[in-house]
C-alpha cells in the first residue's frame, strides 16, 4: 500500500482518515469502526464491502 495514497483518500462514509492494517490488508476508519478490504492492492472503498469492527480492532 502506497502511503502517499493514504494521505489523499478518505473514508467514504465520514470523510475521515483511514489507517492501513498490513496484516489484514484492510483500511480502517476508526471513527466509524469500519474496515475496507484491499483486493489485489486496490482499496475497495464501498460501504457495502466494508465490515464492522470492534473498538478494540480499530485501536490496533
Curated annotation (Swiss-Prot):
Cellular compartments per GO CC: cytosol
Coiled coil: none
Recorded superkingdom: Bacteria
Gene3D superfamilies, per database record: 2.20.25.10
InterPro entries: Trm112-like
Pfam families attached to this UniProt entry: Trm112p
HAMAP family: UPF0434
Family the UniProt entry places it in: Belongs to the UPF0434 family.
Protein name, per record: UPF0434 protein CKO_02153
Amino acid at each position: 500500500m502506497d502511503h502517499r495514497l493514504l494521505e489523499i483518500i478518505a473514508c467514504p462514509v465520514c470523510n475521515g482518515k483511514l489507517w492501513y492494517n498490513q496484516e489484514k490488508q484492510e483500511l480502517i476508519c476508526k471513527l466509524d469502526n469500519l474496515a475496507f478490504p484491499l483486493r489485489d492492492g486496490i482499496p475497495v472503498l464501498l460501504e457495502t464491502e466494508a465490515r464492522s469492527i470492534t473498538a478494540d480492532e480499530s485501536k490496533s
